[in-house]
C-alpha cells in the first residue's frame, strides 16, 4: 500500500475535520504557499451562551492575494484580548478550560505579526493536544509551483512519491478526478462525520473550532475524533 497524502490550507483554530483528515494520512501537507483569502484562514467559531461566536484575526488589506505564510496581522485591533475574553466567558464552566491554558497563552500572550506563523503555531499545538503523530510538510518547503487547483495537488503528491490523495469532502465541487487519474494517483475521500459530544449551553452545534471539543472532552478529544464515539 502506497503513501497516503492529505493537503490542507492553514486555518485559525480549525474544525475537527481538519485533524480527522490529518490523522488518516501518512503525510500531511500544510498548504502555506497559496494565496490568502479572508475566511477560515483567519477566522473560526466557538459556542457561546447565545450561539456561535466568530473569532476573526484582522489581516491587512495588502495581504490579500499574497501567500498565506506572508499575510500580515493588522496591528492595533486588540483582537487577542477580545478573543481570549470571548473564549473564557464562553467556557467559564467548561470541565477542561485548564487543559487549554497553554494554548490560550500561546495565542494571546505573544506578539503575533504574521498570520502564517500564528496559524502554524496554533495548528501544531492543537495537533499535539489531540495526540496526532502524522508528520507535516510545508508546501513552501517543496520548491516553486506553477500549477493550481487539482494539478497543484497532483504535483505535490508526485514530489512526495504519494500513491493516494486523501480529499476532504468539501472539495467535491471543484476537484477534477481525471487530473489525478492521469497522474497515476488514487483519489480517496475522507468521509468525515462530525463527532457528537457533550457541549455547554443549549443544543448541539457541529463543525465549530476543535477548541470546543477540547474544552468539553479534554483528554478524550483525540479518542472521540478517532472513533466517532461520544464522551
Which residues make up each language-model segment?
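Residues lining hydrophobic/aromatic ligand-binding pockets adjacent to catalytic sites
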Residues: 1-231
